[in-house]
Amino acid sequence: MRGLFVCLLVPLMLSGCVVPPQEGPSLEDVTTTGTEADPCQLGFAHAKEPLRSDEEHAMASELSLPSPVAYEVTLHVFWNAADHPADFPPNPHFSPLAGGPHSEGFRLWQPGELASPAIEMQAEAGDPEPLRQAYRQGGTQVLPTQFAVGDLVDSPGRTTVAFRTDSEHTFLSVTSRLAPSPDWFVGVAALPLTSGGAWIEEVAIPLCVWDAGTDDGRSYASANEQPATPQPIHLLKGRPLSTDPEQAAQVGELILRRTE
């Protein structure tokens, strides 16, 4: 029995879990210095670090971890008209959460990089199948049978997917489209599943909205506007989600929980 976890969420400030001291790192262990002031960047700090080769990763302490292990990932969304009244659309929902575990050298998507065709389809149409195919192309860096696809979820609401992983695949990438929207989505990219040589037991990551950079639409129901030049994936700031042009809005949280 792993003990009692008390998960805390303070919107737009900090998210994390109080974990028994003998097991499981906290959110602060997962993230790196410099993210504390911007909760929207939690879960992405690792992507800014130089990647190790697969050979270097094989020598890392993670290989001493017990495996396989099982996790549940819950997408809890609370995007609503009361908190985000500007142009709020009918039928607010999120597409099926899609993604899976992988090794350090693999990227399903990454902030600051151009969206792949698979991410474009997920962000614009909520279609997880191209993403599944892109994931499978990762070879030994992924676990093809563990690519998970959840259910469409109305907002507010929640959906949960499950996956298993091992000591060679200790990162997680998942996405879900905010809909209706031009090309907006939520998710994490290369979120570490370990810290300090231990599997993460439970953690909550704030979810803000990312713009895939593949459509120039500025509101939920905007007509398709193909950009002259695709833009890198970036946080969506200002309207219609936030009244502050410099602020991204939190619309949910991703809760990761180890189940065995």
Language-model-derived ranges and their functions:
Residues 18-20:
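Bacterial signal peptide processing site
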Residues 43-47, 52-56, 60-70, 78-186:
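Structured domain cores in non-transmembrane regions
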Residues 1-4:
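Positively charged n-region of N-terminal signal peptides that target proteins for export
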Residues 12, 33-35, 203:
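Disulfide-bonded cysteine motifs in exported proteins
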Residues 14-16:
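C-terminal motif of bacterial Sec signal peptides marking the signal peptidase cleavage site
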Residues 22-35:
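Ser/Thr-rich, Pro/Gly/Ala-heavy low-complexity intrinsically disordered linkers and tails
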Residues 137-260:
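Mature, soluble, non-transmembrane domains
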